[in-house]
């Protein structure tokens, strides 16, 4: 019985029916079992398990049954096909009759029926004890059900915001790429999800050294300003998630997309309604460790995250770029899309799914989503270009909220993806296929005073505030201007006032009054004029240096040119526009053409530049301080002529300068020797091989006690830079307590002297100049109001500037007239030394005229010095005779003879 049961079970399998051993067509001895075989058959559509069942169960049973069974082909073969009505009647119960219409099963119904039949056969097999559970069907069913179950668990975990252990167990070792490249690995679903969760966890849990949540504060600040950029420090990411930091430079496009999605989820978890402001959050990577030069970018940098720096030379306007585009079918008006537009290629539909037509299609303007697009060009910084090389440049693309983050003239640090794209013009020019390269910007950081103000620490602010309370802070700052240049105290004072600047005004919003102080240096060759300009370029937070010979009118202001590719007119900025909110330094100012010099009239007074060229009518800001250096006519300054006669400049230009500094190269044996000692000592101290003075940079060391050092210690150059930045940004002095009558009287006196001597004209601009200098002096002391000391210093600087431009014949009389103003904040010893030098010069002239030669020792009666000193209210000269200043200038006092001696 067991044998017959076994043979029946095997015969009813699909494999045997395919071999022709179907029990329905077998011998009459087995025909009685046809009904049972039909009811127990698993179905006609079962998958074949021929090889698998034979491999698992073996083939001994069926082979023995076939050998021992009856012969089907033989003499009695016809009897098997005779009609037997009783046995040929099928059971109608549960079966569909042949004459009935049977509906075709769907795929899901067929799969359900097959699953039910497999379950039935499995239970029947277990009941007979012949198959172990899961031998044939369970393994397949589990293989099919497990991905579905895991997929449902993943979706549930993603929706609930919970991390599923089973979901990430297969990619716990994320750095194991399993033979894939980084780009392929991070594009897979499993690693993408793991990176997504790790970065989200990093944003939620990263704290600084003080235990504060870093990104909670940054996200809060970002949402307050309605921005969509979240800055992530690469060093923080590398310290916490080193695997993500390793993947990021290799596959930046894929990683940044995952980071953006994770950041958006974190932001929406904190501020659920922030999606009304923006649907995208862009993660910006800063402080990438390796900085590449523009000229060092090569093929191996393609599609990698790089960091470089340069100066922005040009930029386009902000243009709309397709982000998610939809198309309309012109034949059936069906809306196709959305299609995600990438940077590398344009996505276009092939055919309409509604009417199957191949077009034409047009962009659906209403439903298409755009993003901001701007193209800039950055050029290598002048200081980083190798000797004998020209600066290289590279195009960069700014998207989203990065547009207008920089302007021409800004020095920036750019982090982005180095891409290549097709450029037809390059192929035409080179004759073979080449690709243009462009940097897709991810993060832009400017290097200007705004960044510097933000970088001032609390310790810096405390140090600056304490310095401002020093009574001699003004003298310290004046002495800190170009400390490696000997003498020229008046020039240093004027440049210091120009660096701090006054306060701009706009009464009623109708007329702008500039606050910048313009300075003109004029004098003999070899008097350090250009060195002063170079020093200002280094110490100023924003400076543009140019020369009169190499600068044209459009080079100083602005010019219009046609873009070589798009053929549209673009506006390019000149030196004055690039120096906005900074200093424009012009050397060899007298070498400029008159037409070029006329173009800066508007920029120096109204501080704007009007352009009307090629259909472009606009006005550009040029709010900068102009410091220029010029040589006199004939090469040397002639003191017997006025300033206007010595310099080839027109009166409109001269009147726009607030401070005029005349530098004369006079022969003075004592001063010449002191200058020579100073220069030699400076060379010795700053020689590269002198290791002892290696830490003293930019000549910020303490110089010997000389008259031009004001007798105080100069400030270090870094401290001076921070002091200037803080004062210009935070201090805005007012004029409420200013002595207006003193300024008015000084203006009337200067006008009268100007008309009498025929020197430079005094205009209303000089009143504004005095006010600006008073505000600058108040800003040096970090005062909120202009006091009398500030006005006196402004008058003194204005008078020195005015008197130095006079003829030598009227200079002495004017110094006597304005002696009480010129003596402000001067040390008595300095005044007495000045008077004594005048007496010595008169004695030298007398001896040359009488004896034809100069003696080694000059004697000046003490009575002459005492009389001169009484005129300026100085009665006690004993302190002057004992001072270091008196001895340094090689003077000695003979008490017996009451004579003052000077050795040459």
Curated annotation (Swiss-Prot):
Residues 61-130 are annotated as: Interaction with DNJC9. Residues 111-125 have a biased composition (Basic and acidic residues). This is DNA replication licensing factor MCM2. GO terms for cellular component: chromatin; chromosome, telomeric region; cilium; CMG complex; cytoplasm; cytosol; intracellular membrane-bounded organelle; MCM complex. Keywords: Acetylation, ATP-binding, Cell cycle, Chromosome, Deafness, Disease variant, DNA replication, DNA-binding, Helicase, Hydrolase, Isopeptide bond, Metal-binding, Non-syndromic deafness, Nucleotide-binding, Nucleus, Phosphoprotein, Ubl conjugation, Zinc, Zinc-finger. It comes from Homo sapiens. A zinc finger (C4-type) spans 329-355. The modification Phosphotyrosine is found at residue 137. The modification N-acetylalanine is found at residue 2. Belongs to the MCM family. Its EC number is 3.6.4.12. Residues 62-73 have a biased composition (Acidic residues). Residues 2-257 are annotated as: Interaction with KAT7. Residues 1-15 have a biased composition (Polar residues). It is an enzyme of class 3 (hydrolase). Residues 473-679 form the MCM domain. Changing residue 27 to A: Impairs ATPase activity of the MCM-2-7 complex and reduces phosphorylation by the CDC7-DBF4 complex. A motif (Arginine finger) lies at residues 655-658. The modification Phosphothreonine is found at residues 25, 39, 59.
